[in-house]
Amino acid sequence: VAIDPVEKKPLAEWHPGSRVLSVGSYGCNMRCPFCQNFEISQEGASGVPWREVSPQELVDLALDCAERDSGVIGIAYTYNEPLVGWEYVRDCSMLAHKAGLANVLVSNGCASAQVIEALAPFVDAANIDLKCFSAEGYRDLGGSLEDVRHTIAVLGTSETCHLEVTTLAVPGVSDSEDAMRKEAAWLASVNEKIVLHVTRFFPRWHMTDAQPTPVATVMRLADVAREYLPHVHVGNC
C-alpha cells in the first residue's frame, strides 16, 4: 500500500497531478519472461510480506489519506495482477464509489467477459497492458489476446472510464512496426481517444541476457502508432 501519483500507473491524461492510494498483493495469471515486477507477480503468499485488509478498511484508509492530502482522489488496484482477486477489487470499488472515491485499474486485462463486465461500472480509469498483438504470442505468455481485446473494447467504449493502454517494446516480442500498426489501427477502431504508452524494455527476470530496447525503436513505434492515435506517449526513455 502506498500513495502514488497517477502518472506512475501510468495515466498521462487523467487528473494530472493527482494521487491515488495504490494497493496490491501477489500473483499473476500470466508468465511473461520479461516481467518487470516478477518479485511480487510471480510469488505466492509465502514469498512476499502481506497483511489482510478488508474492503471497508481499505476505503477508510483512502478516505483518511484524502482528508490529510486533498490531492488523493481514489484507489488504484495495481502492482501485481489485481484481477487474480477480482472479487476483492469489485467489493472495494463499490464501497469506494459510495464514499465518493475514484477507482483505477492497472491490469493485464486477461479476464473473462463476465468479470470485466461486472467491474466496468466501477472503474473510472484504467491502464491495460497489451503485451503484443499476436494470438500466438499471448499463448506463449500464458494469456489470451481475445480476452485482452474484449477488456479493452469494454473499457474503451465505456462512458464512465478513461482508458490508457501500455505496450512494452520487448525485442523479438513486441517491437515490430507491422504489429504496432495493426495494434494502433485496432485501438483507434475501438476509440481514437484511447491513450497509448509505448515503453522501453530493460532486461528482467528470465530475459536478463537480452539488450534494452533501443530508444530509436521505441520512438519509431510511437511514430507508427501516431498515424492512427492522437494520444501516444513514450516511457522509460
How would you name each of these model-derived features?
Residues 26, 47-48, 64, 79:
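N-terminal export/assembly segments and adjacent metallocofactor-ligating motifs
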Residues 40-52, 98-99:
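A short alpha->loop->secondary-structure connector
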Residues 26-29, 52, 56, 145, ...:
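Electropositive phosphate-/nucleotide-binding environments in soluble metabolic enzymes
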Residues 202, 210-237:
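A C-terminal junction/extension of Radical SAM enzymes
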Residues 55-210:
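Conserved AdoMet/S-adenosylmethionine-binding subsite of the radical SAM
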Residues 1-24, 38-42, 65, 69:
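N-terminal [4Fe-4S]-dependent radical SAM core
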Residues 24-35, 81:
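Cysteine-centered iron-sulfur cluster-binding motifs in ferredoxin-type domains/subunits
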Residues 32-37, 44-47, 87-88, 116:
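Short, conserved acidic/polar surface loops in the N-terminal third of protein domains
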